[in-house]
């Protein structure tokens, strides 16, 4: 309600798709409709009530009010005028989706209704060799996405080009005492873009700093 003055309070809103209230975006096998990779949807926002959530049903009430239904939303990042976020178990194989939201140039103003923001299904695959359970995400200095996994098997660091092509950067070779592979978390870059930081969550927890010619990316080969 007061741009640039968050301390004054405002309204909690949820993303909805224009003309498709309560849209199920999961693309699970039992979903009532499918959304294609690259498909772009107009966005509007619905106000949420009772946001202190006394009945622990805010998400359910949001969908009933018209908000889109996303599954297991986790990592999110804003960069280059776009918002990217992961749905860790989205897609037909339930191994992840990456969505992109491009805000309207009138975001937050009445004119937004005539020129809405755009939501696009940016990445979705049924091949776990390319991506499995995308979780934390960041935007690299050269414009690619860097995505880390919280999968059921090996945990990888993946890259995604602006065209949506996936490639592999690294694999977590560490194994915990019980034989499990720990998830990778918190990828981010140094201000000069030369160092990639990330965490391995357990076994024990560690933070790594990796130098590299990061712009020399190469497509994944499987």
Question: Where is each model-derived feature located?
Answer:
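Sequence/structural signature of beta-propeller domains
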Residues: 1-222
């Amino acid at each position: 309600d007061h741009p640039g003055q968050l301390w004054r309070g405002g309204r909690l809103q949820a993303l909805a798709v224009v003309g498709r209230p309560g849209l199920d975006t999961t693309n699970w096998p039992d979903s009532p409709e499918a959304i294609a990779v690259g498909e772009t949807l107009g966005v509007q926002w619905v106000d949420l009530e009772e946001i202190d959530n006394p009945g622990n049903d805010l998400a359910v009430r949001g969908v009933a009010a018209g908000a889109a239904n996303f599954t297991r939303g986790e990592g999110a990042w804003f960069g280059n005028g776009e918002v990217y976020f992961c749905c860790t178990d989205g897609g037909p194989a339930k191994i992840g989706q990456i969505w992109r939201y491009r805000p309207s140039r009138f975001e937050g103003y009445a004119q937004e209704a005539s020129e809405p923001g755009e939501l696009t299904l940016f990445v979705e695959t049924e091949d776990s060799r390319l991506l499995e359970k995308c979780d934390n995400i960041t935007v690299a200095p050269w414009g690619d996405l860097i995505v880390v996994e919280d999968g059921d098997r090996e945990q990888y660091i993946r890259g995604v080009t602006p065209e949506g092509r996936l490639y592999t950067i690294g694999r977590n070779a560490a194994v915990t005492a019980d034989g499990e592979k720990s998830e990778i978390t918190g990828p981010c870059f140094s201000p000069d873009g030369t160092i990639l930081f990330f965490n391995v969550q357990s076994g024990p927890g560690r933070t790594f700093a990796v130098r590299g010619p990061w712009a020399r990316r190469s497509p994944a080969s499987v």
